[in-house]
Amino acid sequence: MLTRIHGGRVVDPTAGRDAVGDVWIEDGRVVAPSERAPDQTIDATGCVVMAGGVEVHSHIAGGNVVMSRLLLPDLYVSESAPNGHPFAHAGGSGSWIGANYARMGYTTAVEPALPPSNALATHLELADIPLLDRGGLAVLGNDDHLLQLLRDGEGKQAVRDLVQQTLAHSRGLGVKCINAGGASAFKDGVLKLSLDDEIPCYGLSTRKIMSALLDAVEEIGVPHPLHVHCNNLGLPGADDSLVATLEAAEGRRIHFAHAQFYAYGVVDPENPMTGGFRSAAERINAAMEAHPNATYDVGQVVFGQTVTISLDILRQFGGRKGAKPKKWVISAGDAEGGGVVPFLYRPRGPVSSLQWAIGLELMLLSSNPERTILTTDHPNGGVFTEYPRIIHLLMDAEERAKEIATLPAIVGERSGLPKIEREYSFSEIAQLTRSGPAKLLGLTDRGHLREGAKADVAIYRDDKDRTAMFSRAKLVLKDGQPIVEDGEVVAWFSGKTLSLDVEADAGMEKRAESYLQDRFGAGLDTFAVPDAAFPENTGTFEDVACRA
């Protein structure tokens, strides 16, 4: 069926479009304008038309996500029972995630922490999220097998083969490195780790582990750069860790997760841990400007109750003292040790207010929103449903000033946010939430409205209240089919799980099988993600090609 979206303000920065025009769709794809009469015309007069939103970093599936629901069941408001069902969905469930992203105009979301040892369970949860295409990033950097290879000096080929085998068996879309060596060091009593500190038992450092993974990702041709969670997250002086890690990449492609939590400069150099922190947003952005090989997502903080989820067991163990309410879970399992710690970002608290300001400052200082991706590191900085409010604050300096006026003076004393007058345009919002994350993930078929793109389209009524505008899309199309009308889901269906098209090296498979049998008494099949685990004839997975 040929469909024309007519009369809307079409915003597609990848094509230089920001004007009233039409978008043509046929067979689930954007097509060139046709001389044929459309079978259907969608009136978008008075509306803004964008590609569907793309989420690059949101914790939406996996063991720690499940644990967070059990630990803090009151975090989300439960939904009403669907028609024909006796029970309501649990708050934060797959249907809640899919519906709330779709209402905001998002059509793709990525879970950034896919533990290879828990890959099947995580993929089953991802497959339970309706309306969205989704994927996961395989976590490496603390597992004993990789660290053994590096300790024994087996060379780049062996590391590459192990990374490729892990991607193939976990069906990951990319690779994430979380405080490389930190979980391993924690098991030997280490409570703080920096880039060049030695990791007990292995004689390695974060720098060496990360460098090996950077090389492997490039050699395999993974479209998404190595997704890095640095040392010392959330501590005064964390900006030093990010900048040092950026320089250690030595020009190789690298993506930094939740940069806001690293944009903390030391206030008192003589008492760095007790003197508090100040914004290092200017320093972080200057460093990024000097290194075009790098990108980051923000990890914006929003006020209110949340729960922090991370495989960075060092940080979660340290953060347990600030848990609110006072309950937490810490796990030191092989490779994927981590923790779940509830946290309250107090609306008038000086620390929370400064964190809030730093995230906005990072985005408003960025000269290239395509390299500055909007995230809240859901749920760590807050719930992703706050994106519309964040967008409002970026687009409206007056609204931002009103909010700042309600916050403690520390926001002006230790950040530059109150002095920034910049307002984001629609094109910059599209870069921040569409073209930037799609390009970063290597998903060339989305994030834009050029010919050949997936017909994932969001149509918003142009409203000066940008929070309202982006909270409830007028119409959302997924593969050309309407899934949301006037902010309500009108059709439920399952999207695809995106996974990298790679094959495991036969020799490394044999080595991995032997290693796992010796260590766990279980082989590769135990950790596999077979098609048979998913409903027949649904085509759950969709391959994403490696870079040439």
From Swiss-Prot:
<keyword id="KW-0554">One-carbon metabolism</keyword>
<keyword id="KW-0479">Metal-binding</keyword>
<dbReference type="Pfam" id="PF07969">
    <property type="entry name" value="Amidohydro_3"/>
</dbReference>
<dbReference type="InterPro" id="IPR011059">
    <property type="entry name" value="Metal-dep_hydrolase_composite"/>
</dbReference>
<dbReference type="GO" id="GO:0006730">
    <property type="term" value="P:one-carbon metabolic process"/>
</dbReference>
<comment type="pathway">
    <text>One-carbon metabolism; formaldehyde degradation; formate from formaldehyde (H(4)MPT route): step 4/5.</text>
</comment>
<dbReference type="GO" id="GO:0016810">
    <property type="term" value="F:hydrolase activity, acting on carbon-nitrogen (but not peptide) bonds"/>
</dbReference>
<comment type="similarity">
    <text>Belongs to the metallo-dependent hydrolases superfamily. FwdA/FmdA family.</text>
</comment>
<feature type="binding site">
    <location>
        <position position="59"/>
    </location>
    <ligand>
        <name>Zn(2+) 1</name>
    </ligand>
</feature>
<comment type="subunit">
    <text>Octaheteromer. Part of the formyltransferase/hydrolase complex fhc; composed of FhcA, FhcB, FhcC and FhcD.</text>
</comment>
<dbReference type="InterPro" id="IPR050378">
    <property type="entry name" value="Metallo-dep_Hydrolases_sf"/>
</dbReference>
<feature type="binding site">
    <location>
        <position position="57"/>
    </location>
    <ligand>
        <name>Zn(2+) 1</name>
    </ligand>
</feature>
<dbReference type="InterPro" id="IPR013108">
    <property type="entry name" value="Amidohydro_3"/>
</dbReference>
<dbReference type="GO" id="GO:0046872">
    <property type="term" value="F:metal ion binding"/>
</dbReference>
<dbReference type="InterPro" id="IPR032466">
    <property type="entry name" value="Metal_Hydrolase"/>
</dbReference>
<keyword id="KW-0862">Zinc</keyword>
<feature type="binding site">
    <location>
        <position position="227"/>
    </location>
    <ligand>
        <name>Zn(2+) 2</name>
    </ligand>
</feature>
<keyword id="KW-0378">Hydrolase</keyword>
<dbReference type="GO" id="GO:0046294">
    <property type="term" value="P:formaldehyde catabolic process"/>
</dbReference>
<dbReference type="InterPro" id="IPR012027">
    <property type="entry name" value="Formylmethanofuran_DH_asu"/>
</dbReference>
<comment type="function">
    <text>Involved in the transformation of 5-formyl tetrahydromethanopterin (5-formyl-H(4)MPT) to methanofuran (MFR) and formate via the formylmethanofuran (formyl-MFR). May be catalyze the hydrolysis of formylmethanofuran (formyl-MFR) to yield formate and MFR.</text>
</comment>
<protein>
    <recommendedName>
        <fullName>Formyltransferase/hydrolase complex Fhc subunit A</fullName>
        <ecNumber>3.5.1.-</ecNumber>
    </recommendedName>
</protein>
<dbReference type="GO" id="GO:0005737">
    <property type="term" value="C:cytoplasm"/>
</dbReference>
<keyword id="KW-0963">Cytoplasm</keyword>
